[in-house]
Amino acid sequence: VAIAVLTVAVLVTGFILWPKSPTNLAEENAQARAQLLQQWKAGEIAVLVRHAERCDRSDNPCLGPADGITRIGSEAAAGVGQGFARLGLQQTDILTSPVTRTVQTAHYMFNSDPQTQEWLATCGTTMRNDVVAHKVAHRNLVLVTHSGCIADFEEQTGLKHAAKDAEYTSALFVRIDGSGQLQVLGIVNAEDWNDLLK
């Protein structure tokens, strides 16, 4: 009996301490949301945004090339862009992967064509350090990238068991302080921006 109780205790403790997927920031209490907004105003935030719906994996009408996004995806990207605009983009650097679907997503999200960066397409074992290296003090950083890159980042920040396929146009928010210390804050899915900013 003692062994069974000990086994259950170990399993429960392991489950509680098991790093899981980031929390949905739109479901946080008002104080947590206010803290996120304060950190955004201070320029302490980096956000990894997954591109919009892929044309080559959907039956929805495409905007153009098959490696781009769908019309529905462009509308979702524009909606997420409105959320970022409500946060304020005056002190925000925006970078995108050079792949067509991320470039199109960034264009519809921000009504501009942000600078492309190859590391946002290749990702891999240096993703966490690359994000920190590109984050300028007192300026937010928005990175339009891919689900595999977001998964690499989550694994390198201790979320080894996070869901591996981020939703289209979902945004992973991270706080990076002046000394490069990183804290994953959570995600905002495309449909949750109004709840986040209420």
Spans of features found by a protein language model:
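Short helices/loops that flank or line small-molecule/ion binding pockets
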Residues: V131-A137
